[in-house]
Amino acid sequence: MFIVNNDIPKHNNAANMSTVSSIIDAIEIVINAKMRRTGICGATETLLCHEKVINSILPDIIEKLIDQGCEIRADRNIKLLNKNINDASEKDWQTEYLDKIISIKSVNDVSDAIKHIEQYGSNHTDAIITENYKTAEIFLNEVNSAIVLHNASTQYADGGEFGMGAEMGIATGKLHARGPVGLEQLTTYKYQLRGNGQVRP
């Protein structure tokens, strides 16, 4: 799952904060998160879009996704943006497509996004794009996923990227011990990554 908040990340340029580069970064993050490798567990399957940016940044994201052969399934608010968007069903919000398909839903705020993620998410990887530090911290701390990212692609959800070597599997449960259980076996991790527009090559 992924949320584009109404506060798009801004990065310094020589003169001032550049909103244009921020929008480009946000678009590139979303495209990379979905399309870099669609068949991996870190691929974004649902995009939750803040209602305030539906008409500004989302049309560009939708156009780029469609240009790359991605099928879009969306709620009524999003569907109005492009005639090539299909209706999303209740099942779409919880589907791991592992393909060039994405579901898009509008949300009122970060709390609305978190509620959606709690109801439909896999507890694997979730990300937020925002320059608002407070909003990002709420998301990072309240979303109950193994990996949560701020301003970076969900494609970073990989053991190799965490310096763990070859990835043998993914666990999203909080308790994964088997056999004798000591203090170390009761330990679980939540990884929080803070980015600045990073996409995975």
Positions of PLM-derived features:
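Conserved C-terminal structural/oligomerization subdomain of aldehyde/semialdehyde dehydrogenase
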Residues: 89-201
